[in-house]
């Protein structure tokens, strides 16, 4: 991968207006506070405007209305944060994979390997696995029988796909995530729990990113489905038969119980718990550590839980909360007595 770009090249890549030397070389990205010569910074939040006078960055990504506050090389764009996201791909060494198959890899019968695939050391492919063009599998990854991995999809080290899992194009799966393990399905009986065998699979759309050590269980009968453009953080649990709509974002430590359906363009913050068999409509934002116990049919922001306070204050409030029912009954009695007078 190329490691340096002229400002002219970056301006063309970002469709940006260039102010400064078109031949000036950018070799890395950095924050306003830490940047030095030949590094590109950006400002997306006005709170950082105070650093424009002192930054040592070689050039900055700026909105046009910030241009007058900075005298150095500039790439002017409507949305600097989006531009930074796009240009970050040019300087990320982790996206480099060399085509080829490591001699320690095990390739099952009937596999179809697309053009330019990269298969690292100790990868195991079951029978009838299909890899799209440019797909890359990191060391120690295990792919079960009959899985499909789309073009340019990248799996980091020690990813596991159970039998029949399907991944779309341009996905990223980080280290240690597991897709297609059995959902938590058991029928109670007098003699103990009877396992319900999970006969569905997991189907993931295009441009999905799944964080490290996240688990997505296979469906009991229907497939668990993750639609296009979904982003999922580390350490998320998604149970069997769940459906996640397009472009929804799910932060770390969230757990979603079985058969819940979540709409498109939702944001679910960290450590949210969502019980099973619910429907959450499009455009819902759920704040951190919320417990969702019923379906949500209107877009908007939803919260639950008690925010942090000093321990002494929290203990007083907790004691009062335990007395809330009694206080409510006393208030009702007072209102009735006043009405009777």
Swiss-Prot record:
GO terms for biological process: lipid A biosynthetic process. The lineage of its organism: Bacteria, Pseudomonadati, Pseudomonadota, Gammaproteobacteria, Cellvibrionales. The active site is at residue 240. Belongs to the transferase hexapeptide repeat family. LpxD subfamily. Its EC number is 2.3.1.191. This is UDP-3-O-acylglucosamine N-acyltransferase. Pathway: Bacterial outer membrane biogenesis; LPS lipid A biosynthesis. SUPFAM superfamilies: Trimeric LpxA-like enzymes. PANTHER family: UDP-3-O-ACYLGLUCOSAMINE N-ACYLTRANSFERASE (PTHR43378), UDP-3-O-ACYLGLUCOSAMINE N-ACYLTRANSFERASE 1, MITOCHONDRIAL-RELATED (PTHR43378:SF2). Signal peptide: none annotated. Pfam families: Hexapep (PF00132), Hexapep_2 (PF14602), LpxD (PF04613). Catalyzes the N-acylation of UDP-3-O-acylglucosamine using 3-hydroxyacyl-ACP as the acyl donor. Is involved in the biosynthesis of lipid A, a phosphorylated glycolipid that anchors the lipopolysaccharide to the outer membrane of the cell. One of its GO terms (cellular component) is membrane. InterPro entries: Hexapep, Hexapep_transf_CS, LpxD, Trimer_LpxA-like_sf, UDP_GlcNAc_AcTrfase_non-rep. Homotrimer. HAMAP family: LpxD. Keywords: Acyltransferase, Lipid A biosynthesis, Lipid biosynthesis, Lipid metabolism, Repeat, Transferase. The keyword Lipid biosynthesis applies. The gene is lpxD. It catalyses: a UDP-3-O-[(3R)-3-hydroxyacyl]-alpha-D-glucosamine + a (3R)-hydroxyacyl-[ACP] = a UDP-2-N,3-O-bis[(3R)-3-hydroxyacyl]-alpha-D-glucosamine + holo-[ACP] + H(+).
């Amino acid at each position: 991968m190329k490691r340096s770009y002229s400002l002219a090249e970056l301006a063309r890549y970002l469709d940006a207006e260039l102010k400064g030397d078109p031949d000036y070389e950018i070799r890395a990205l950095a924050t306003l506070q830490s940047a030095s010569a030949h590094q590109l910074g950006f400002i997306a939040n006005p709170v950082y405007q105070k650093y424009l006078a002192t930054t040592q960055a070689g050039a900055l990504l700026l909105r046009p209305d910030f241009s007058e506050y900075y005298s150095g090389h500039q790439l002017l764009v409507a949305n600097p944060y989006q531009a930074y996201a796009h240009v970050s791909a040019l300087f990320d060494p982790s996206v480099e994979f060399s085509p080829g198959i490591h001699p320690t890899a095990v390739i099952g019968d009937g596999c179809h390997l697309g053009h330019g695939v990269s298969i690292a050391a100790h990868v195991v492919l079951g029978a009838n696995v299909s890899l799209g063009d440019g797909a890359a599998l990191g060391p120690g990854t295990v792919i079960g029988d009959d899985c499909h991995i789309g073009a340019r999809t990248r799996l980091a080290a020690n990813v596991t796909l159970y039998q029949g899992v399907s991944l779309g194009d341009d996905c990223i799966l980080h280290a240690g995530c597991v897709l297609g393990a059995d959902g938590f399905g058991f029928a109670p009986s007098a003699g103990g729990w009877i396992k319900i065998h999970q006969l569905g699979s997991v189907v993931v759309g295009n441009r999905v990113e799944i964080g490290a050590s996240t688990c997505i269980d296979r469906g009991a009968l229907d497939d668990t489905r993750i639609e296009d453009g979904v982003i999922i953080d580390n350490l998320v649990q998604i149970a069997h038969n769940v459906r996640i709509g397009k472009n929804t974002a799910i932060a770390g430590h969230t757990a979603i119980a079985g058969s819940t359906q979540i709409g498109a363009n939702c944001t679910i913050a960290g450590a949210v718990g969502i019980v099973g068999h619910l429907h959450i409509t499009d455009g819902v934002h759920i704040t951190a550590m919320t417990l969702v116990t019923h379906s949500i049919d209107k877009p908007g922001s939803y919260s639950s839980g008690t925010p942090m306070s000093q321990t002494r204050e929290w203990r007083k409030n907790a004691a009062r909360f335990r007395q809330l029912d009694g206080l409510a009954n006393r208030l009702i009695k007072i209102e009735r007595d006043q009405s009777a007078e």
